[in-house]
Amino acid sequence: MKQVAFVFTQAPHGTSAGREGLDALLAMSALTEEIGVFFLSDGVFQILPGQHPQAVLSRDYISTFKVLPLYDIERCYICRESLQERGLSEEHAFVIDVEALDAAALRERLDDYDVVLTF
């Protein structure tokens, strides 16, 4: 079975990319167990708790990331440099457990995947 990587690069509100990526991720989990999830650039905001999307008339889908372990999706990575550029750190609380890696290590991990989908 092919290994599939989901890369979140967009902020959670303002576009539907994050929600669509999460929907695709959950759907793909029925087809393969070889899934990796990567958060880089503004995508690091996808898994920050305490957001209030209703204030900008958006749907709150962020808490749905919490179900990933129930779907056996446990390989989740976040870009250390992206966090630092946005004033965050790897010690910050996120809605899921993620492993912080530098950009070079993230590229190496992504090279292991047959298919890379970016949202």
UniProtKB/Swiss-Prot annotation:
GO CC, any one term: cytoplasm
Q: Which is a GO BP term held by this UniProt record?
A: tRNA processing
- Keywords of this protein's UniProt record, alphabetized? Cytoplasm, tRNA processing
**Localization annotation:** Cytoplasm
What residue intervals traverse the membrane?
none
Q: Does the keyword RNA-binding apply?
A: no
What does this protein's UniProt record list under function? Part of a sulfur-relay system required for 2-thiolation of 5-methylaminomethyl-2-thiouridine (mnm(5)s(2)U) at tRNA wobble positions.
The text of the family note is: Belongs to the DsrF/TusC family.
Name this polypeptide is given: Protein TusC
Taxonomy, top ranks, is: Bacteria, Pseudomonadati, Pseudomonadota, Gammaproteobacteria, Enterobacterales
